Amino acid sequence: MKNNLRYGIRKHKLGAASVFLGTMIVVGMGQDKEAATSEQKTTTVEENGNSATDNKVSETQTTTTNVNTIDETQSYSATATEQPSNATQVITEEAPKAVQAPQTAQPANLETVKEEVVKEEEKPQVKETTQSQDNSGDQRQVDLTPKKATQNQAAETQVEVAQPRTVSESKPRVTRSADVAEAKEASDVTEVKGTDVTSKVTVTESSIEGHNNTNKVEPHAGQRAVLKYKLKFEDGLHQGDYFDFTLSNNVNTHGVSTARKVPEIKNGSVVMATGKILEDGKIRYTFTNDVEHKVEVTANLEINLFIDPKTFQSNGEEKVTSSLNGSKTEKNLQIEYKNGVGTYYANVNGSIETFDKEKNKFTHVAYVKPLNQFKLGTVTVSGTVTQGSNPNGEKPTVKIYEVTNDGKDLPQSVYLDASDKNKYKDVTNEMQSKLTVQENGNYTLNLDTLDKSYVIHYSGEYLNGTNEVNFRTQMFGYPEQRYGYYYNSYQLTWDNGLVLYSNKADGNGKNGQIIQNNDFEYKEDTLTETVTGQYDEKQIIETEENQDNTPLDIDYHTAIDGEGGYADGYIETIEETDSSAIDIDYHTAVDSEAGHVGGYTESSEESNPIDFEESTKGIVTGAVSDHTTVEDTKEYTTESNLIELVDELPEEHGQAQGPIEEITENNHHISHSGLGTENGHGNYGVIEEIEENSHVDIKSELGYEGGQNSGNQSFEEDTEEDKPKYEQGGNIVDIDFDSVPQIQGQNNGNQSFEEDTEKDKPKYEQGGNIIDIDFDSVPQIHGFNKHNEIIEEDTNKDKPNYQFGGHNSVDFEEDTLPKVSGQNEGQQTIEEDTTPPTPPTPEVPSEPETPTPPTPEVPSEPETPTPPTPEVPSEPETPTPPTPEVPSEPETPTPPTPEVPAEPGKPVPPAEEEPKKPSKPVEQGKVVTPVIEINEKVKAVAPTKQKQSKKSELPETGGEESTNKGMLFGGLFSILGLALLRRNKKNHKA
């Protein structure tokens, strides 16, 4: 009896435990069902780091492709890059990101997951979750727990992928080592080392030319030399290869700009080579990967050479050289600097020393010196930013240097070497009581006596976004009396203007095939194009696209096409090679400068790499003065250079006294021209219309004419069919004399209307057109005519040599000429270009099938990684899994990304599952959505199975094998327990 009771109690306990355990297994496995798909995917992980943002949020980009088979186990690859720490606890939550579909077909589906790591030290728990939304709409929670790692072995990451579940649930973890070391190493390579291919460069043509192809350069007039190269490269260029050439130390490529860059070499919109300036005048161009597999590569380079004011300080002849692969190009140039503005007893000169466009700052150097041993009394020197001043800027810095040896050794190039203490003495502190500096950028220096030469160094800023900067140096004073003579006061003004230029660079290439290692060959079919256009403040105006297979011609041309006129000022040039977007003065490049330019004009040249050909034509207008005015016993001498660069022709007012032409060429064009109202004298001059190769219909309106006609008035009609040479006739013309205009008033000369309709004409005559004449449309003419007024129309159909005729039909209506009012003393020409603009061509990458993957960012503080989260046991007696040890080499763990269907672009519906309720709700607003991109640098791991599932809208699923077996196992436990309990009851009854 006792044995039966003892066995019954044991069976009761065993049965109850079995029922409880089976129920827990069934419930737990039911909450965590996952459909195992039969698709094959390859898992690779690539990690890179970028700098953290200001708010300490770093982004880690992980490119993964998951391997899923119909087996029960799922494998994930990751590389641990985060160092766990027991002292620091970090919670990272992900914000939602957009999902993009893959762009090209790959053997495996590629995903890019961007996660923003936000560090919060207030929360004690260690937790790292990733919420993502895939195409099926379900959400998953990813837990990352680092495993053990020694210093001599790579750190590994355990990746757990599970659905939301209860706290007491514990799911077995499926892990495997990261086997993508090769892909990671390839992605970590940030710089490709190439070889020096200077020896493989052949100089076919080279030259150094002065301004306008002369041997003369005036640096203060904005002039510079140009280095021209035609280069040929041997085949087999690779990414990272470079070539160098060296310039002489008396020239540079930047002018007064603080930027030390050279423009990129482009083939259309593709960068073929990047340039940079090295020490000792060396320039290096490094090829990009777009030069791979290119053959017959040639380059045309035109680089500006600015005279260095530090090296060459005086007027004279200077030799400029450039060397490339043993080929030396040289030129003797005549250098001439300006002397500023002055009188017999004083002189003022200056220049803009540097110009920093990024910081909106510039420096200026001014010379103030007496001449001929005069002592000047009550002298006032002022510096003013007349254009481009920043009223809200900081106070400028002004330093004053006293020059020894009476200023005779001052460089003509207007250069200050403040470190030369023997030549320049800093007297700024002594002049503080006499110096006034204002916040708007102006300064004033008052001197009781000027008997020494001074150099004033100014450092200030200009208004951001301005298109012109002008700095004015002015001196006013009285010279001392000599020999009983009293000298008048004087005022000297010297303006330093700044003009910005832009470099251009374009080119095209020729594709070829190169056999490598005799094992395989590369044949590239990339797009070759040349895109040209015009840049100004309104961005792209016009583009032109040419597609061909010509050699790679790179054109760098930044020289001014032509400068004419009288330039008295100091015009400096800036060549700035900033690769960022240019926001100042794309329209201020000067093709032609005309007029009297007095003052110091500085030119800034921007050589940012663009593949559009700029139109650098402009109009320079301005008030120019170079005079001396004596008024009220005072003498004023002013030299100024006010340059305004205008894209559009200005309105003109006044009298038109010259021929006004309108020329239209080579197009079917309807031109409406007519004279409007003119104020002033009614002398039109000559109105000339030239139409080439066109069939012309002319409608003339002569209208009403009032006044007296004192001469013979005649109307002559010639309709003869046969005439000798130099006579008229040949056509029958119907004339309606009712339409002859009324003529009234006084005309001293013969008034005649002559019509020539002959068919045959001798040489040197024009004709060949049929013209309809309507005399009703004759315009009204009022006033006195003191000479013969002749209206002659020629309607010949046949002409001998030298005739002008055509095949295009053009209608001219004379009464639609634009209104011209005002006074014009020259010939006004209006040219109309009817070439239709070509829209810009979008940029096409040379290798669209291999886009560059995004670079993931490294956490800003790798010393505070996230330690693993211990799991909560379901029962008190259940042992807790051991916590992994801290790896010795910290790395950032990368969570696996949600799976993407094998066929991108088609949505995958979710598998039929029961609703799942997570035990811990995830914070709203902080989720991560995978961004699907293509990473060509990641080497995919070979799939475990060769056969992939066919593309379809609904992927094949392998059934719920692992979870069903668990539920079956739990159910058997429950049934066994119930059986034992029932048997126990029977024993009790017995």
From Swiss-Prot:
Residues 545-604 are annotated as: 2 X approximate tandem repeats. SUPFAM superfamilies: Bacterial adhesins (SSF49401). Residues 707-850 are annotated as: 4 X approximate tandem repeats. It is found in: Secreted, Cell wall. Residues 1-35 form the signal peptide. GO terms for biological process: cell adhesion. Residues 33-61, 96-193, 702-969 are annotated as: Disordered. One of its GO terms (cellular component) is extracellular region. It is a peptidoglycan-anchor. Coiled coil: none annotated. Residues 836-910 have a biased composition (Pro residues). Residues 194-511 are annotated as: Fibrinogen/elastin/tropoelastin-binding. Residues 37-511 are annotated as: Ligand-binding A region. It comes from the Bacteria. A motif (YSIRK-G/S signaling motif) lies at residues 7-18. Residues 512-834 are annotated as: Fibronectin-binding. Promotes bacterial attachment to multiple substrates, such as fibronectin (Fn), fibrinogen (Fg), elastin peptides and tropoelastin. This confers to S.aureus the ability to invade endothelial cells. Promotes adherence to and aggregation of activated platelets. This is Fibronectin-binding protein A. The lineage of its organism: Bacteria, Bacillati, Bacillota, Bacilli, Bacillales.
